[in-house]
């Protein structure tokens, strides 16, 4: 199996992030706190810090790799930037100016900004003002018709992709004079105004989640709540879009392993591999952790029987369903809510990543021994 370490930290985990040297992990145990653990051995983790400032559930955590700062957001509509001073983490309040919950957060590639998605149909772009010694929040208020479920920065540090429960994926310019430079790799976005919409994708007819850019920034991927995953090439005026449907439960988040391979995680409790062939056509490949590639020959009648048994609480059907889950890996016992790469940002390939879920576990996966099984796309 590709999983190399599994540890249960809590009853449930909302989100998690790793320190720059990967020796510590920050997680929210589905409450108002952020717990920081340090690995003493493969089987033993020590809790070093408990960050307590939020009044409601912490919904997003990101740990910067260069400045070693932690940013957190919560349903209490606030954000904190935590700096390590001596042996203590010191918080700085960031007033987001939201009237609904903050749902997700991510540092920009240069770590001079971070983006916050919210239930207020708004995206906050926050940056630090040296003159006033505080964090400023600029709002992108237009276009979104519902909650912003995820945000993803383009490698050029200017473009930002978002997904929303209105079913749409959008790309905005976040160029801020005095913060961003005009020598951005993408020439036109640096000339656009802050908050200007570059692209809107209407591919999903259900809630959309988990948007991510490929390492080069040429491809965009996100998922829909209707068990669909979408891939968009040549993001711009004439994008090339593909939709891949799968028969299992919906995904919640995705991660590009390489330019032609994506890992998706969600309600099926096991990572799924999608890859593009030599012609650029994307398809589902297999589950990570199962002993062999997923077979398309499984009878739909047996699947219906399992579902029927679950609905009526049948013990025999429940056992069958559990056996099927174990054959796919069985690392997580509940929905996987987040996937985080383990390695240097901007790397063309990701060999290791971690997942966390509602079962309170964090699993570390290593694809080093699976390259032959995953094929040339890796």
From Swiss-Prot:
MF terms in GO? actin binding
- Whether Cell cycle counts among this entry's keywords is no
Biological process terms from the Gene Ontology for this record are: actin filament organization; Arp2/3 complex-mediated actin nucleation
Region span, Disordered: 319-340
Taxonomy, superkingdom: Eukaryota
Q: Where in the cell is it found?
A: Cytoplasm, Cytoskeleton
Q: Name one Pfam family in it.
A: WD40
Quote the cellular component terms of the Gene Ontology held in the record.
Answer: Arp2/3 protein complex; cytoplasm; nucleus
Tissue-level expression: Expressed at low levels in all tissues with a relatively highest expression in inflorescences.
Its chief place of residence is cytoplasm
WD repeats mapped onto the chain: 8-47, 53-92, 97-138, 143-182, 203-242, 257-295, 331-375
Q: Which UniProt keywords apply?
A: Actin-binding, Cytoplasm, Cytoskeleton, Repeat, WD repeat
Q: Which InterPro entries match?
A: ARPC1, WD40/YVTN_repeat-like_dom_sf, WD40_repeat_dom_sf, WD40_rpt
The record's note on quaternary structure and interaction partners says: Component of the Arp2/3 complex composed of ARP2, ARP3, ARPC1/p41-ARC, ARPC2/p34-ARC, ARPC3/p21-ARC, ARPC4/p20-ARC and ARPC5/p16-ARC.
- Family per UniProt? Belongs to the WD repeat ARPC1 family.
**Which purpose does this protein serve, as stated in its record?**
Functions as a component of the Arp2/3 complex which is involved in regulation of actin polymerization and together with an activating nucleation-promoting factor (NPF) mediates the formation of branched actin networks. Arp2/3 complex plays a critical role in the control of cell morphogenesis via the modulation of cell polarity development.
What this protein is called in its record is Actin-related protein 2/3 complex subunit 1B
